[in-house]
């Protein structure tokens, strides 16, 4: 059974409301689709200084906009990620909405992006974010779908657990950068697809070379071959 997926490789600016509008507009422009996938931190600059100020509790404005959009379009919507505020903590959270607008799954990024590459990128998510602790899958008419976030995907065991739970498709909102992207983006998505004998989808923000954090782009779909 055919599954039409739109990857929303959108620009992310400092204007939170405009980012939400842009995401919704691009999903509408995708036309006749079954599923849309937004990128990591789709409504927030990828910057530790921004995560808490741009954050919202579950059920906040961005959550409601995505729920309404899924219902309006009658699609499965993997809502990228946004900073979720909960009990004075901040999580990098992906909400998944069913075609009726109901929450189908929620994944908090488990493996925080803490790297310091000599001559390259330094970023420490753990300075502001708290890690999640769950493996996330959800049922669709096309079968089980797994979801994780960016750095999660580097850890083979997490992908294996999703596949063991029945996932034939693993969807990954991600924001690899100009250091990690050229080295590992395509490699990881092809490797996980072959190892797990599943399809993999990686959705990135658009590249903005003027941003403080420059995303690699190159949203990708890989088959098990």
Predicted regions and their residues:
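Short beta-strand segments enriched in small/hydrophobic residues
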Residues: 1-11
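Active-site beta-strand/loop signature of hydrolases that rely on acidic residues for catalysis
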Residues: 5, 27-52, 70, 77-78, ...
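Residue-level recognition of beta-strand->loop/alpha-helix junctions
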Residues: 9-11, 108, 204
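Conserved hydrophobic/aromatic positions in well-ordered beta-strands
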Residues: 6, 95-97, 220
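Active-site catalytic loop in hydrolytic enzyme cores
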Residues: 85-165, 178-188
């Amino acid at each position: 059974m055919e599954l039409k997926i739109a990857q929303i490789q959108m620009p992310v600016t400092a204007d939170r409301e405009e980012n939400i509008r842009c995401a919704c507009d691009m999903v509408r422009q995708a036309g006749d689709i079954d599923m849309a996938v937004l990128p990591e931190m789709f409504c927030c600059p990828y910057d530790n200084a921004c995560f808490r100020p741009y954050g919202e509790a579950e059920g906040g404005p961005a959550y409601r906009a995505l729920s309404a959009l899924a219902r309006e379009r009658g699609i499965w919507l993997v809502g990228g990620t946004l900073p979720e505020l909960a009990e004075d903590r901040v999580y990098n959270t992906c909400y998944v909405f069913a075609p009726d607008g109901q929450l189908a799954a929620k994944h908090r990024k488990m493996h925080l992006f803490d790297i310091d590459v000599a001559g390259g990128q330094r970023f420490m998510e753990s300075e502001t974010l708290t890690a999640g602790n769950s493996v996330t899958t959800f049922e669709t008419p096309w079968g089980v779908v797994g979801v994780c976030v960016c750095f999660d995907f580097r850890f083979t065991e997490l992908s294996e657990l999703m596949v063991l739970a029945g996932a034939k498709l693993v969807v990954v909102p991600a924001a690899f950068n100009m250091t990690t992207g050229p080295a590992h983006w395509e490699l990881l998505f092809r490797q996980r697809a072959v190892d797990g004998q599943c399809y993999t989808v990686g959705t990135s923000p658009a590249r903005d070379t003027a941003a403080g954090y420059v995303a690699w782009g190159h949203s990708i779909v890989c088959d098990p071959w």
